Amino acid sequence: MKRRPTSKAWLQEHVNDEFVKRAQRDGYRARAAYKLLEIDDKDQLIKPGMTIVDLGSAPGSWSQVAVQRLAGQGRVIALDILEMPPIPGVEFIQGDFREEEILLVLEKSLNGKPVDLVIADMAPNISGISDVDQARAAYLVELALEFSREWLKPGGNFLVKVFVGSGFDEIVMAMRDSFEKVVTRKPKASRDRSSEVYLLGLKRRNA
């Protein structure tokens, strides 16, 4: 994981960023919306009638995309420790998805309905120490993968942000154990200097 540029340089880059401008114009809460839009255009992940869980959802741009593409048919359930302002059509559960009480809320909300797609655009708080940040990021991916194994229906799909570096190959191997196919995506909205990519696990294997 690479260091962020200085605050002044980052602010200048942010203000001039094509995807930031598009997000403001299109009403998305973050430029990350265009990452999911591009991946979904390519892989056709989101289909009307689906139940989708968005892990680490705040500020909510991926939930916005998901609910738009469901077109009123299906459900988006978003989870985050942080607060997230309401999004029409999105059910939000605030809390840590590792905790039993939060999972019980999710279970009650699902009411026996299987999850078709898990999406997770999570990143740790950046310390600036590369090895520490990489380990934190890998841990988040492991948590999301564990969640997908538990909650995704057989044949369901899983999309997660990963930072290329130490532990990356192990994450890919772990996903291959759980999904019939694993592919890497680097959408245009991912900054070139960023080591982030998205791993897509297709068709969860039967447990």
Swiss-Prot record:
It is found in: Cytoplasm. The active site is at K161 (proton acceptor). Keywords: Cytoplasm, Methyltransferase, rRNA processing, S-adenosyl-L-methionine, Transferase. Pfam families: FtsJ. S-adenosyl-L-methionine binds at G60, W62, D80, D96, D121. It is an enzyme of class 2 (transferase). InterPro entries: RNA_methyltr_RlmE (IPR050082), RNA_MeTrfase_FtsJ_dom (IPR002877), rRNA-MeTfrase_E (IPR015507), SAM-dependent_MTases_sf (IPR029063). It comes from the Bacteria. It catalyses: uridine(2552) in 23S rRNA + S-adenosyl-L-methionine = 2'-O-methyluridine(2552) in 23S rRNA + S-adenosyl-L-homocysteine + H(+). Its EC number is 2.1.1.166. Its main location: cytoplasm. GO terms for molecular function: rRNA (uridine-2'-O-)-methyltransferase activity. Disulfide bonds: none annotated. One of its GO terms (cellular component) is cytoplasm. Specifically methylates the uridine in position 2552 of 23S rRNA at the 2'-O position of the ribose in the fully assembled 50S ribosomal subunit. Belongs to the class I-like SAM-binding methyltransferase superfamily. RNA methyltransferase RlmE family. NCBIfam families: PRK11188.1. This is Ribosomal RNA large subunit methyltransferase E. The gene is rlmE.
